[in-house]
Amino acid sequence: QAMTELLGRGRHFSAVACYNDSMAAGAMGVLNDNGIDVPREISLIGFDDVLISRYVRPRLTTVRYPIVTMATQAAELALALAEQRPAPEITHLFSPTLVRRHSVVAPQEGDKS
């Protein structure tokens, strides 16, 4: 629905970053239905690297967070607090990874959108 509204505004754009991969897959469907080639005309990127990102065509470029590591550390912290053990004095920084697939290309020369 958001992609339909965006296309309806009549403005030129060359890329869309979506909140998650499911929304990106929906946006890709709308673009395809409107005869817009992903990524040649519009690049598309998702977020979370769920299964659908590997099965849409073109395969979706996305951002992956280390969810299992994050969940494990959160569970360990919750258990420590539940057992009234002191919480570790550690700050955890989790770095995302760009998963390059086929839905993004470099902008065309002179494209400022």
Where are the regions that the model predicts?
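Flexible loop/turn connectors
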Residues: T4, G8-A17, D21-G110
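ATP/NTP phosphate-donor binding region
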Residues: Q1
